[in-house]
Amino acid sequence: MTRIQLTSTLALAALLSVSWFAFNACAAEPAVVIPAPVVDQTAPAGGGLQNVVLAGGCFWGVQAVYEHTKGVTQAVSGYSGGAKETAHYELVGTERTGHAESVSVTFDPQQISLGKILQIYFSVAHNPTELNYQGPDSGPSYRSAIFYANDEQKRIAEAYIAQLDQAHVFKAPIVTKLEALKGFYPAEDYHQDFLVLHPTYPYIVVNDQPKVGNLKRLFADQYRDTPVTVMAANKPSQ
């Protein structure tokens, strides 16, 4: 993995920030304005929350985007695509586990549709035309992938990718893989809510804060200032 190791750099971030910014000044991905999906789910008359697992590079930024999205009740950073036994940060970083850094997005379909979730995913959460890398991070664990849980999710995602490619919305073809969800394994606690807890960490400032800003700018109706966080969800009730 190409991100600076957390064990030492959180303490050294202030000292390294000047040189780090100079090296990664162009790392942030630009947002792309894209049309809404023609094929989408209809809000069910009843039922509960739904979930989709998305991979789009470093999970810090993807998680932050959905934590600020109205209708999302939880966004958890984790790993998908490999075995439970190898779902650990250090092992995933070897690029031999099959895992992708992913975010499990739980949402209320009465407030936001899967199609809108995917519109945000393709436009501000990551660049879907980059094969096995995102910004400064490279390797299969940073691949663009939608881990679909059922046929409806697969159908909507397939149709949307075809729609965007046919419209030539991006300068290059979309490389997002559709993979059947076989398991999602939450990442270590120190990865959860990383942007919320470390908003001035250099990697976050350069690569991920712009994503949240683009969400607010391009999806004002879906944006919320106060994020829904994992730590808040796990906080014991009084």
Task: For every predicted segment, state its role.
Residues 2-5, 16-238:
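Flexible coil/turn and secondary-structure edge motifs
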Residues 10-13:
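Sec-dependent N-terminal signal peptides
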